[in-house]
Structures are given as structure tokens and as C-alpha cells.
Curated annotation (Swiss-Prot):
The gene is pckA. ATP binds at residues 198, 217, 233-241, 282, 319, 444. Mn(2+) binds at residues 198, 217, 254. The lineage of its organism: Bacteria, Bacillati, Bacillota, Bacilli, Bacillales. One of its GO terms (biological process) is gluconeogenesis. It comes from the Bacteria. CDD domains: PEPCK_ATP. This is Phosphoenolpyruvate carboxykinase (ATP). It is found in: Cytoplasm. It comes from Bacillus cytotoxicus (strain DSM 22905 / CIP 110041 / 391-98 / NVH 391-98).
């Protein structure tokens, strides 16, 4: 099937009598309720369940092996290849399936807040609530922009269409397949809305570096003086909590590009975790869950329609999707200058990494490639004690290109724009998990504040004798002894042993990066 035939099939689908294009939020909410796809909650949000898939399905994600991308993609377990023939057959079947539906829902918008680099996108949904989700999460167009909405990358989403692995070449009934040549993402067999969000992110992670733009899995905010900060970190490291600051405006909570102009948000909304959400802990997120917002897999009381954010009966991965302008303290459009400060967050359960340290360019590249944190008991089945986990560039499931490409771009941009980089450990102090205690949040906030204010630029530091990190000897509002992790342990020998153990895990993980500059390893990695 040629690209032309693919577009003809899509054109027929979009022009069918069942296609509902660019419905407003109230219209979509009505559709969700009329079609029994979800419930209205007490705050006016829509609550929907995603069935058996309550998270992403990384083993069901494929990229079509096409001539134009075959030599560019880092093929492997993250980027699994599928043939053009298999894609074409499955695509045809999905289109035929959707043509028979009574209603389809179409959203047209953009990914990328910088007009110079934005990607026109359109999403064809079997479900109205999925269409509401993408309407809130991506960038919504003006009438004028809609009239000039050309050559979009299209997501075709059919959750109730199940693949047959024996026939279709998939690994299960679920599939997420990207064709860069045909500019199509085909999703089926899963109702988890996050697949649509992350498909567009994966696409931007391929397209942006081709234009010399670094795509990043991070949150970003800007201070009153226009100073920009990026926060990288895996789940549970405090990225959302620490980047929500009353004195700084949010650029975005999850996905950004860094171009020659500065930083821009890839999205037009937020996809926040809801587990144990409360107004006291996270008022911005709590208050954003109102009419038009989407709650995913959150238990809602049948009578009162009040959401119970502590109930994990369906999953711990409960989510809320809402437009970024549901938050007061934001920058619109979601663009800003070059980052002054970059913060890598890690929740080190071994309790050996300093609570804050300054990184050189090589150390920044090393820790960016490592993407270290600890998985804690209860976050995944089978995890009974904390495990070191490494997610390349803090976002390995979404990187189509070789990881070194992203790291090199980061290094170049840090050098060019003189960005200061810090590694902040929000994990354990005074011993490993089970012995020590979690880092005091007030201290972490004070350290982040000092980094952002430039108070650590000239402070005296000491080199960590195992990790080679520059550890500040003093941070305002933080006791000096907290800054030196070994001083918080009762047993110094046990500290050293644990630190060497973690350093060895870093080294072992880094062996997979066989094509990175030796400087990154020699100047950026552990010294012991």
C-alpha cells in the first residue's frame, strides 16, 4: 500500500458521515455520558476506566521498518521493527472496522508550542473520552490555524479492535505502530489513553533532533527574572512537587524541546498522577480537575460522585488530564529562553548519593545517559526491596534514536548556554531504605532554591571520593552535616561499601553505551 493509498483511505474515513470533527469540550462530555463511556464527578470532570490495560504496553510498540528510517532508528526491545506489509494489512483492517462505527471523533491540533517547530497532528478516535483526552492534552488550534492545518501526523485509535498475533505479527491483541513515512500511528487493543500522548512524544523524539532540537522528558518553569529551569527525573523522584513553585511559572510538566531559540513545551496540557492526591499536598493539580478534565482509573463514589484518590483498586497509575491553562501560574504560549539551571532528580534508596551536587558537562552527560533512580517495594509486582533502575535520558521507552545523540546535544547546549547542572537526591539519608529516612522535603526545596538563585555558583565544594561529584559545604537553611551523606551514617565502613556497590551498578549499566566519548566515562562517571 503506497503512501497515496494510505492517505486516500484516511480521507474517506475523515469524510464519512460518522466522523465528528473538532467537537467542543461540552459536546464531547455529552457524548461520553450518552455513550456510557464514563461518569461525571462532583467537580465536573469525566471519569473513565481503561479496562485491563492500566498503563503503557512497551512490548506492543513497533516502528515500521521503512527505507527512510531503517538506518536511523536504534532497533531493539524498545524500538521493535515491523514490516511495511504487516502494517499495511493491519491498517486496512482497522480502517474497515472504524468505517462501520456509528460515530468517530476527530481532533486536529499541534505538538510543539514554538510555531517554528510545531507538528500538525490529528487524532481519529473510536471513543469520545479519548478524543476529550487528546483535546485537553495537545495544543488546541485557533480557527485560523485550523484552516491552515496541513500534512498532519495522524493517530488512528481503535481500542476495541484486537489484533491476532499469528496473523498480524504483533505480540498480543494490543498494538502501537508508528509509520514515519506514512505519518500514521496505529493503536488498537488497548484503552489506555497515555499511549496516544507517548506516541506523539516518541515521534517528536525522532523529528526534533533532525532539526537540531533536543527533545526532553522533563518539567520546566521560569522565574520572575526570566531564568529557566529544567527538572529531569523518573517516577517518584519529586519532579512534579519540586517544579510547582509559587514564585515560578510553569512552562510544562512533562515534555519539552530545546532549540536555538530556547525551551518550548511539546504539549498543551498535563497528565498528572493522582495517587493520594490532596488539596493540601498539590493544590494546583487538585484544583485543575474540573469540567472538561479527564480522570483515568480513579475510583468514584456511585452516589456522591466524589473521587477517592487513595483507592488503588484498579491501579496505582491513576491519572488526570487537563489543559495547561487550568493552572493559574503558567506561561502562555508555553515558550521561554535557554535554561540557566538543570536539575536531575534521583530517589536513591541506597542512601549514598549526596542530597545535592554540582555536575561538570561530562558528569551531566553521564548522569543523563544513566537516568538513575530506585524502584521501591509496591510500585511494581515482584519488587519487595528497592532496586536500582536506569532509564536512559530519563525516558528510555520513548527514544527512537541512539541515546548518545541526545546526550551529545545536551552537552553541546550546556556548554553553549553555560547552564548549571545539579544532581539532587530526594531519596534516603542516614542509611539505606529500611535503616535511614527519606530526605526532608523542606531541605530539598531549600537546596533547589539555592541552585535556582545562583547561591551555589561560588560556594566551596568538596569532591565525593567515590562518585567524583562536587558537593557544596554549605547551603542556606540546610544543616551542613546533611550535605555529606557519609556523616549521616552511623557506620562509615557500611556507607563506603554501599557507595562502591552503587558505583559498580552505574559502571555495569554504562557498558551498553559502547559508542560514547571516553571523556564521558573518564570524567563523568564514578572515580572509585
Amino acid at each position: 500500500m503506497s503512501t497515496v493509498n494510505v492517505q486516500i483511505g484516511l480521507h474517506e474515513l475523515l469524510n464519512g458521515s460518522n466522523a465528528q470533527i473538532q467537537l467542543s469540550v461540552p459536546q464531547l462530555v455529552e457524548k461520553v455520558l450518552m455513550r456510557n463511556e464514563g461518569k461525571l464527578t462532583s467537580t465536573g470532570a469525566v471519569s473513565a476506566s481503561t479496562g485491563k490495560y492500566t498503563g503503557r504496553s512497551p512490548k506492543d510498540k513497533f516502528i515500521v521498518k521503512e527505507p527512510s528510517v531503517a538506518n536511523k532508528i536504534a532497533w531493539g526491545p524498545v524500538n521493535q521493527p515491523i514490516s511495511e506489509e504487516r502494517f499495511n494489512k493491519l491498517y486496512t483492517k482497522v480502517l474497515e472496522y472504524l468505517k462501520e462505527k456509528e460515530e468517530l471523533f476527530v481532533f486536529k491540533g499541534f505538538a510543539g508550542a514554538d510555531r517554528n517547530y510545531r507538528l500538525p497532528i490529528q487524532v481519529v478516535n473510536e471513543y469520545a473520552w479519548h478524543n476529550l483526552f487528546v483535546h485537553q492534552l495537545f495544543i488546541r488550534p485557533t480557527e485560523e490555524e485550523l484552516a491552515n492545518h496541513n500534512a498532519p501526523f495522524t493517530i488512528v485509535s481503535a481500542p476495541n479492535f484486537k489484533a491476532d498475533p499469528a496473523v498480524d505479527g504483533t505480540n498480543s491483541e494490543a498494538f502501537i505502530i508508528v509509520s514515519f513515512e506514512k505519518r500514521i500511528v496505529l493503536i488498537g487493543g488497548t484503552e489506555y489513553a497515555g499511549e496516544m500522548k507517548k506516541s506523539i512524544f516518541s515521534i517528536m523524539n525522532f523529528l526534533l533532533p533532525e532539526q537540531d532540537i533536543l527533545s526532553m522528558h522533563c518539567s520546566a518553569n521560569v522565574g520572575e527574572e526570566g531564568d529557566v529551569a529544567l527538572f529531569f527525573g523518573l517516577s517518584g523522584t519529586g519532579k512534579t512537587t519540586l517544579s510547582a513553585d509559587p514564585h515560578r511559572k510553569l512552562i510544562g510538566d512533562d515534555e519539552h524541546g530545546w532549540s536555538d531559540n530556547g525551551v518550548f513545551n511539546i504539549e498543551g496540557g498535563c497528565y498528572a498522577k493522582c495517587i493520594n492526591l490532596s488539596h493540601e499536598k498539590e493544590p494546583q493539580i487538585f484544583d485543575a480537575i474540573k469540567f472538561g478534565s479527564v480522570l483515568e482509573n480513579v475510583i468514584v463514589d456511585d452516589k456522591t460522585r466524589i473521587a477517592d484518590y487513595s483507592d488503588t483498586a484498579l491501579t496505582e497509575n491513576t491519572r488526570a488530564a487537563y489543559p495547561i491553562d487550568a493552572i493559574d501560574n503558567i506561561v502562555l504560549p508555553s515558550v521561554a529562553g535557554h535554561p540557566n539551571t538543570i536539575i536531575f532528580l534521583t530517589a536513591d534508596a541506597s542512601g549514598v548519593l549526596p542530597p545535592i551536587s554540582k555536575l561538570s558537562k561530562e558528569q551531566a552527560m553521564y548522569h543523563f545517559l544513566s537516568g538513575y533512580t530506585s524502584k521501591l517495594a509496591g510500585t511494581e509486582r515482584g519488587v519487595t526491596s528497592p532496586q536500582a533502575t536506569f532509564s536512559t535520558c530519563f525516558g528510555s521507552p520513548f527514544l527512537p534514536l541512539d541515546a548518545s545523540r541526545y546526550a551529545e546535544m545536551l552537552g553541546e547546549k550546556i556548554e553553549k548556554h553555560d547552564a548549571k547542572v545539579f544532581l539532587v537526591n530526594t531519596g534516603w539519608t542516614g542509611g539505606e531504605y529500611g535503616v535511614g529516612k527519606r530526605m526532608n522535603l523542606a531541605y530539598t526545596r531549600a537546596m533547589v532554591q539555592a541552585a535556582l538563585n545562583g547561591e551555589l555558583d561560588k560556594v566551596e565544594t568538596v569532591k565525593h571520593d567515590i562518585f567524583g561529584l562536587d558537593v557544596p559545604l554549605h547551603v542556606p537553611s540546610v544543616p551542613d552535616e546533611v550535605l555529606m551523606p557519609e556523616q549521616t551514617w552511623a557506620d562509615q565502613a557500611a556507607y563506603k561499601q554501599k557507595a562502591i556497590e552503587l558505583a559498580n551498578q552505574f559502571k555495569e549499566n554504562f557498558k551498553k553505551f559502547d559508542n560514547v566519548s571516553k571523556d564521558i566515562i573518564n570524567l563523568g562517571g564514578p572515580t572509585a
